Amino acid sequence: MQKYIKEARSLLALGIPVIIAQFSQTAMGVVDTVMAGAVNATEMSAVAVGTSIWLPTILLGQGILMALTPIVAQLNGSGQRKHIANRTQQGFWLATFLSIMVIAILYNSRFIIEAQHDIEPELAEKAIGFIHAIMWGAPGCLYYQVLRSQCEGLSKTKPGMIIGFIGLLINIPVNYAFIYGKFGAPQLGGIGCGVATASVFWAMFLMMRYYVRRAPTQRDVMPKKRLVLPEFHTIKRITLLGLPVGLALFFEVTLFAVVALLVSPLGVTAVASHQIALNFSSLMFMFPLSLGIAATIRVGYNLGQRSTEQARTSAITALAVGLMLASCTAIFSIIFREKIALMYNDNIEVVTLASHLMLFAALYQLSDSVQVIGSGVLRGYKDTRSIFFITFIAYWVIGLPSGYLLGRTDYIVEAMGPAGFWIGFILGLTASAIMMGTRIWWIQRQSDEVVLLRSER
């Protein structure tokens, strides 16, 4: 029992700074929406539409680069720190290629937005302007992710927390300047949010670069040469390891976007209630997500130490701590569901329906916790391909179809509206949690030689 308590302390020491870093990142999006909304509804809608295209695209890139975390953790644990600089440099090359891809997609976002024939021309133009502004922050965002993955792989999660929080603080005045044309900046409205956020991503990268170059704990992993040529076999290895994670994130974000579209014909009350439950769940999601990142670090490090038993302890502890935290957040969601809904909206119909949906959101948190921490454990074992297949099946084969059948049709029961989609979420995430748990159990039953060989990929 003592070893699990000790491991829980290590996981929380890594996970708490990540929670704050993730909160800062999420809050930047909230700040953009709120500050644009203070101008008028069109500006806020433009930011919302633009973000719905920007977010899945950049998350795909970030997910691929997250593969660096278990790679660095394994090298750190196995005493091969001298190879970390090379992996980080190749990570920068990969981030450069991904940035070009992201910018190319976002530059042509006009075709995606204008394909929606019922969108107002002014809203479309402002959304495109926002995307064309924020896309120049993609390289800064992805370069920052490379250095953050290096730090997290070395069990240094506090730099990401501090720099993420500073980025949030910078974002507010820079937003204000570009939205309203203050301090000599042009008045851009919602487009100014894109300019501000892109600028903040570059500032965060430069701050993280300064930390990495100056920190005593990072000196021995600094590259000997400033510039090295791309090693395509190394870049390929990172990509093959990270692509399933990136696609899993992409599938998750696009699933919620599709569900929002499917709920929209049900009326304003249904859409607002669904959005309240989803937004609050997203805030609670930071806890298991952060523990999942901590689990990746601990499992990867222990496998580098060639201790499959300790890696197993890390995995079990992370899942147990995650379930306990999810139980607490679920109980909190149930008890205070009406007060939470009132924080978002004071319309009695919206609050009533949102309070009802929060009951489903509470159950959702339990299975979501297991599946997201399970994903982190599998990343630590470098078993990322299974994450892709599990996520695709759980979200798009089980979750979305069952949600649609329950929410919009009367084939099984009378159409349940938004509640049907939330039951679909629960079914999909529960299936994902079971499949993740089964996969972890299968890996841990294999011989130490097989597990360690996989971890050295």
Curated annotation (Swiss-Prot):
CDD domains: MATE_NorM_like
Annotated InterPro entries: MATE_fam, MATE_MdtK, MdtK-like, Multidrug-R_MdtK
Function as written in the Swiss-Prot or TrEMBL entry: Multidrug efflux pump that functions probably as a Na(+)/drug antiporter.
Predominant subcellular localization, coarse grouping: membrane
Name of the protein this chain belongs to: Multidrug resistance protein MdtK
Localization (cell): Cell inner membrane
TM regions (residue ranges): 11-31, 53-73, 93-113, 127-147, 160-180, 188-208, 243-263, 276-296, 316-336, 357-377, 387-407, 416-436
Gene Ontology BP terms: sodium ion transport; xenobiotic transmembrane transport
Annotated Gene Ontology cellular component terms: plasma membrane
Keyword set, alphabetical order: Antiport, Cell inner membrane, Cell membrane, Ion transport, Membrane, Sodium, Sodium transport, Transmembrane, Transmembrane helix, Transport
Family: Belongs to the multi antimicrobial extrusion (MATE) (TC 2.A.66.1) family. MdtK subfamily.
A molecular function GO annotation: xenobiotic transmembrane transporter activity
Its membrane topology: Multi-pass membrane protein
